Design a protein with these regions (language model features):
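Active-site histidine-acidic residue metal-binding/catalytic motifs
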Residues: 100-176, 180-184, 199, 205-207, ...
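Active-site-adjacent mobile loop/cap segments within catalytic or ligand-binding domains
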Residues: 194, 237-276
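Active-site-adjacent loop/helix surface patches within enzyme catalytic domains
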Residues: 169-193, 229-233, 244-252
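Short linear recognition/processing motifs and adjacent strand/loop elements at protein termini
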Residues: 1-117, 124, 135, 147-149, ...
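Active-site-adjacent substrate-binding region
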Residues: 215-241
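Surface-exposed patches in mature extracellular/periplasmic domains of secreted proteins
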Residues: 29, 156-164, 188, 231-240
Length: 276
């Protein structure tokens, strides 16, 4: 990938300014917030690729660049992708005019009143407990996707630590909740046991940080009751997070993990694989 020139001492403005090739219309520009990586991507798909590559070799970004660490661009067959590394997790507002994309970076708290981070456990080679037909990493991801469908219809802003088969380090998962100043961090896990007779739902809470009002214990209790009610399941109670529960024990925002069921129990294993 090629570096994008950043003019740091440019004019006094609130906006980070990205020049767009003259042949490109607004509907050919897409912005993606890769908040887990603290990156903002601007994708440009011109009607036909001309000398767009040369355009970014000659034209840098300018304006208010204090939240931008650096920038690169990659040219693919039909599109150019500009990738900007940011100093933190931000939301953005954008305006496109005179072939310039004006971007304003805003802390999530300035835009949203309610912020939640959902953390589907496991990922990649860390499958979690697995049977011949399914791995825990897929169950937690499916639960997150189902939650997204519901939560997208509310006024709650939700950040997800993963939405594919990736496995971010525990520090990055916790870091997202801290950076977004989330009201709560909810981790989704799957249980397993030696005995196939064991079943039910448990919630793990962070006991290290006492948060008055609505804290980790209250969150864990609420999660367990909601899940048990929704699936007509059995509540096994609340468990204090141990040092191994890094994501929950390191968080300084209210944090709890909901262990949705036992993959080692025949009946629950079937339930966990159902679409609904």
């Amino acid at each position: 990938s090629n570096r994008i020139d950043i003019e740091r001492d440019s004019e006094n403005t609130n906006y980070f300014c990205v020049p767009i090739p003259p042949s490109v219309r607004v509907e050919n520009v897409t912005i993606e917030n890769h908040y887990m990586d603290r990156q903002l991507w601007v994708s440009i798909e011109p009607e036909k690729m001309q000398d767009e590559e040369a355009f970014y070799e000659q034209n840098g970004v300018y304006g208010n660049c204090e939240k931008v660490v650096d920038g690169h661009f990659e040219v693919e067959r039909k599109r150019i992708c500009l990738q900007f590394q940011l100093t933190d997790v931000y939301e953005y507002r954008s305006i496109f005019e005179d072939n310039t994309l004006y971007i304003e970076f805003v802390p999530p708290r300035e835009v949203y009143e309610k912020i939640v981070v959902i953390d589907p456990a496991y990922g990649r080679e860390d499958t979690g407990a697995a049977t011949e037909s399914v791995a825990s990493k897929d169950i937690t991801l499916n639960v997150a996707k189902a939650l997204k469908e519901k939560l997208d219809k509310t006024d709650i802003k939700v950040y997800y630590t993963r939405m594919d088969d990736s496995n971010p380090e525990a520090e990055r998962r916790v870091g997202l909740a801290e950076a977004a100043r989330a009201d709560m961090l909810i981790r989704i896990e799957v249980n397993s046991a030696e005995s196939s007779k064991q079943y039910g739902t448990e919630a793990v809470y962070n006991s290290r940080f006492f948060i008055p009002g609505f804290g980790s214990v209250e969150l864990a209790d609420l999660l367990e009751r909601e899940v048990v009610t929704a699936i007509s399941g059995k509540a096994n109670g609340l468990i204090e997070a141990s040092a191994e529960d890094t994501v929950i024990s390191e968080a300084t925002v209210p944090a709890a993990a909901i262990k949705v069921g036992y993959l080692t129990n025949g009946q629950e294993s079937i339930l966990l694989q159902r679409e609904d």
